[in-house]
Amino acid sequence: MTQRIYLFNPDNDLALAHGGGHYIAPPFAQKMQNDLCALPMWYAEPGSLVLVSDEAMREWVDSTSERLGFTIKGITPDSLAKANDASFCPWGWSGTIKKRLIKRGVKAHLLPSDAAMEQVRLLSHRRNSIAMHHFIQERTSLPLSPVPVEYDDFNEVLDFATKHPGSYIKMPWSGSGQGVYHAIEPGTIEFERWCKGALKRQESLLCEVGLDRILDFALEFKCENGKAELLGYSVFESDFHSQYNSGIVGSKQHLYDIIASKFPPLHDITPTVTESVSHIYAANYEGFLGVDMLLYNDGGTTKLNPCVEVNLRATMGVVTCMVGEHILPKGSVGRFKIEYSKSGFHTSQENRIYLTPILPDTKYCAYIDLG
C-alpha cells in the first residue's frame, strides 16, 4: 500500500519565483522550515508519515500522535532512500523541492515529472487569478472588485499607481504578502527601482486598486482527479503589506457564520468559486489550494474581491481548517499564530496549544490561543 509522506517547505513561493531547481533558501527560511517541520501532522491523512529534521522532532511527532490517538508517524531524512512505494505531499511543489528529495535518495519515478513541475509554476502565475476573476464575474450578478491589470512596462505601472493611490503592485510569482509593493507614493526612486527590478526578473507586474478592507478570508480546497473539493473556510488578519498575521480557529460552520454575517451571499458565490478552481486549476494540478478573498467597503456597500490570490499549495488556512474541525474541543474557538522569538519560548502559557515542538534551539513556533 502506498504511504503518503508530508513535508513542510515554506519557501516554495520563493522557489517558484526563482524558477529552475537551484534555488537556495535564505537562512531564516531554512530555520523556519526546521522549527515548523511537524506542522503537516495536523492535516495529514491517517496512517501517513511527516518528514522532520531530526530524531528529537520525530519523537515529538510520534508521542503527540499517540497521545491524541492519531496514526501519524515522523520520519527523518536519512530514511527517505528506503521509501520504495511512497507518495510525497510537500507544502508546495516546485522543481526545487523535487531536486531536494532526489538529493536525499528518493527515487525519481516516485515524484512528478519535470513537465508537471513546470505546469505548476505556470499555473502559479498571478495572471491565472485574473482569468479566475473573469470566470466568476461572468457567472454572478454580485458586485465585485475591479479586475487586476498586467503590465510589462514601468511607465504603464507608474501611470496606474499614480491614478490609483494606495494601489498594490504584485510580482507574478509571489505569495503570502511577499513580492507586493503598496504604492502609497509611486513617484519615488524606491518605487521605480523595485518595479524595474521585478520587471527584469519576472517580465511583468500585476496592478490592483487599493480597497477599504473589511474582512480577509479564504476558501480552502483539495484538487484531486480533475475536481476541486471544498475543505472549508479560513478567516485571517493581514498587515498593511498584506502579509499573514494570524487566523481564527473554529469549526467549519463557525467560520462560515463569521463571513456570512458580513456577506450573506457567501452561500451563492462558494459553488461558483469551486467551479472556477476545477475549471482553471484542477485539470492540471493535484494537492491543496487556497483562494484568498476580501470583503471591502465601497461607499457604504460591502463588496467582494473574489480572488486576491490563489496559492497552489497547503496554506495556514488549511491548518486552521483541519485543527478547528477535527482537533479543537467542540464549541471552542482560538487564534492561530506563527511566532518568532530570538530568545526561545516557554511551554507553560495558559490556554495555549503548541502545534510544533519547543526545543532548546527553537526560534519559530506555531500555536493556538484558546478563548
Regions found by a protein language model. Name each.
Residues 30-39, 43, 51-159:
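Conserved N-proximal alpha/beta basic substrate-recognition cap immediately N-terminal to
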Residues 133, 161-182, 201-213, 291, ...:
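ATP-grasp fold ATP-binding core
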Residues 147-148, 166-191, 217-218, 240-258:
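Glycine-rich phosphate-binding loop of ATP-grasp-fold ATP-dependent ligases
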Residues 165, 188-244, 295-307:
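Phosphate-binding site of ATP-dependent enzymes
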Residues 201, 243-303, 341-350, 354-359:
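A long amphipathic alpha-helix within ATP-dependent nucleotide-binding catalytic cores
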Residues 221-275, 311-337:
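ATP-dependent carboxylate/phosphate-activation module, predominantly the ATP-grasp catalytic core
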Residues 285-345:
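C-terminal structural cap/anchor segments
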Residues 328-371:
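Peripheral (often C-terminal) accessory segments that flank ATP-dependent C-N-forming ligase machineries
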